[in-house]
């Protein structure tokens, strides 16, 4: 299928930014939910990248879930002229959130284990 170059570029840029694309299986939908192009163009462009091994596809409940592979990151980086330091959001490692630590008090009084036996 012939997809206009500017639409293909929008799809590839969004895929590289996010690392994941979700598309509803509705070929007649006039516009994709997140990318400013037709839904059919998104599905077919990502289907092409899947056949080349740049994207992994999962289908569930009438939605396509496309995930970028390592080869896909390199391919899009060369195609879109993106420097080495920039990665998709799914590839960035976030610092683990600090969990609140419980207070270390003495032994608990009362309760199930603290009952005196008669």
Curated annotation (Swiss-Prot):
Question: Which protein are we looking at?
Answer: Small ribosomal subunit protein eS10
Which family is this protein grouped under? Belongs to the eukaryotic ribosomal protein eS10 family.
- Alphabetized GO MF terms: RNA binding; structural constituent of ribosome
Q: Where is this region: Disordered?
A: 91-118
Q: PANTHER family annotated for this entry?
A: 40S RIBOSOMAL PROTEIN S10 (PTHR12146), RIBOSOMAL PROTEIN S10 (PTHR12146:SF0)
Organism expressing this protein natively: Candida albicans (strain SC5314 / ATCC MYA-2876) (Yeast)
Q: Which UniProt keywords apply?
A: Cytoplasm, Ribonucleoprotein, Ribosomal protein
* Lineage: superkingdom: Eukaryota
Comp. bias intervals (Basic residues): 106-118
> What assembly does the database describe for this protein?
Component of the small ribosomal subunit. Mature ribosomes consist of a small (40S) and a large (60S) subunit. The 40S subunit contains about 32 different proteins and 1 molecule of RNA (18S). The 60S subunit contains 45 different proteins and 3 molecules of RNA (25S, 5.8S and 5S).
Function, please? Component of the ribosome, a large ribonucleoprotein complex responsible for the synthesis of proteins in the cell. The small ribosomal subunit (SSU) binds messenger RNAs (mRNAs) and translates the encoded message by selecting cognate aminoacyl-transfer RNA (tRNA) molecules. The large subunit (LSU) contains the ribosomal catalytic site termed the peptidyl transferase center (PTC), which catalyzes the formation of peptide bonds, thereby polymerizing the amino acids delivered by tRNAs into a polypeptide chain.
Localization: Cytoplasm
GO CC entries: cell surface; cytosolic small ribosomal subunit
